[in-house]
Curated annotation (Swiss-Prot):
Keyword Glycosyltransferase: yes
Entry function: Regulates the transcription of the pyrimidine nucleotide (pyr) operon in response to exogenous pyrimidines. Also displays a weak uracil phosphoribosyltransferase activity which is not physiologically significant.
Species, as recorded: Mycobacterium tuberculosis (strain ATCC 25618 / H37Rv)
Protein name in UniProt: Bifunctional protein PyrR
InterPro entries listed in its UniProt record: PRibTrfase_dom, PRTase-like, PyrR, PyrR_bifunctional
Binding sites annotated in the UniProt record for substrate: T57, R58, R98, D119, D120, V121, L122, Y123, S124, G125, R126, S127, R152, V176
This protein's encoding gene: pyrR
Length: 193
């Protein structure tokens, strides 16, 4: 977040994750994906084609970083892209209009692939539900998993993440802000009231 984002965080805030913590966490999630999806044995019978799709905005950046780490650690190129959920949200009439983001699906599409949705914060689960609806219009994956940097609880839908960087118990009056250098000039996670 830039200066405006910093001002929106408010006076009562504390750092949950430093830049180094964010880097280590993304690295750990990448290793977990490699192990859980059998990417470390890409010719094995259970090794699926894996596609990472980020939910805009910061989920896309996280998907890009995860894909880079997975390639670095395993030598396997993982397709990655973005999945715009704007028109699938259930709060379109409640919240102010937002610009459409773009959906970019890697070559080969998502049919029969293991799609891992990537987001920065898992809260109510409504963004993930919107992503599942959007995904249905893009193709038919073999399976769908979810990776998040922060899980703050307070689910309103029966969803859970397969890969979680950090579980952070919060109150509903608190906000979790993920900062990524590509958008905010630095990495970090802050909680505020």
């Amino acid at each position: 977040m830039g200066a405006a984002g910093d001002a929106a965080i408010g006076r009562e805030s504390r750092e949950l994750m430093s830049a180094a913590d964010v880097g280590r966490t993304i690295s750990r999630i990448a290793h977990q994906i490699i192990e859980k999806t059998a990417l470390d044995d890409p010719v094995g019978p259970d090794a699926p084609r894996v596609v990472l799709l980020g939910i805009p905005t910061r989920g896309v950046t996280l998907a890009n970083r995860l894909a880079g780490n997975i390639t670095e650690y395993s030598g396997i190129h993982v397709g990655h892209g973005a999945l715009d959920i704007t028109l699938y949200r259930d709060d379109l009439m409640i919240k102010p209009p937002r610009p459409l983001a773009s959906t970019s699906i890697p070559a080969g599409g998502i049919d029969d692939a293991l799609v891992i949705l990537v987001d920065d914060v898992l809260y109510s689960g409504r963004s993930v539900r919107s992503a599942l609806d959007a995904l249905r219009d893009v193709g038919r994956p073999r399976a769908v998993q979810l990776a998040v940097l922060v899980d703050r609880g307070h689910r309103e839908l029966p969803l859970r993440a397969d890969y979680v960087g950090k579980n952070v118990p919060t109150s509903r009056s608190e906000s979790v802000h993920v900062r990524l250098r590509e958008h905010d000039g630095r990495d970090g996670v802050v909680i505020s009231r």
